[in-house]
Amino acid sequence: MKNCMMADQRGRSILKHQPVVGDEALEFSRGLAPSTFGFRYAAYMDRNHFLPSGRTAVKHIADPTLAYVMTRYRQCHDFVHIITGCGRSIEEELAVKIFEWKHTGLPLGLLSLLGGAPRLAAAQWAHMRLYWEWASRNAPCSRHGEPAVPMYLNVPWEDMLAKEYDEVVAYTGITPLPQFLEKRQQH
């Protein structure tokens, strides 16, 4: 993950400045217009009774840069829920984990899929193929040397809070899962 961040200009800037998403970002987001990315973030956090400060600190990683990368991975998880349009059902959480695995290569996503699979009904399990396709289409890629879909750790989410949700979707190139599923049903 560090190498992917170092290979990207925005990623290098994030590693240099090491922004941390704190409770003040959530408080700021609560006052934003309903059409903004930040408002959706605040609504998600409040609905689930989450606070940015509620995340356990990264431990057992001696290298400060690698520790920050893991901190960013944890903090960006909530932003991934917002940009992908995924809630917190087991099925949606597994879709997010597949998406995160496609972006980071961390095996946690696949392990979560294996751990969550027994809790899914047959119809829900059948959806996993669609979620895999969606995550694959939203994996980091570039066109003409420019990132079409940046690795999500390289997105300056903390600077996107006041922007319109649709503007953030366009910036990231990520198709939210509900939109992907709607298009699939039309075909």
Curated annotation (Swiss-Prot):
It holds the Pfam family Coq4. The keyword Metal-binding applies. Its cofactor is Zn(2+). It is found in: Mitochondrion inner membrane. The keyword DNA repair does not apply. This protein may be expected to contain an N-terminal transit peptide but none has been predicted. Component of a multi-subunit COQ enzyme complex. This is Ubiquinone biosynthesis protein COQ4 homolog, mitochondrial. It comes from Leishmania infantum.
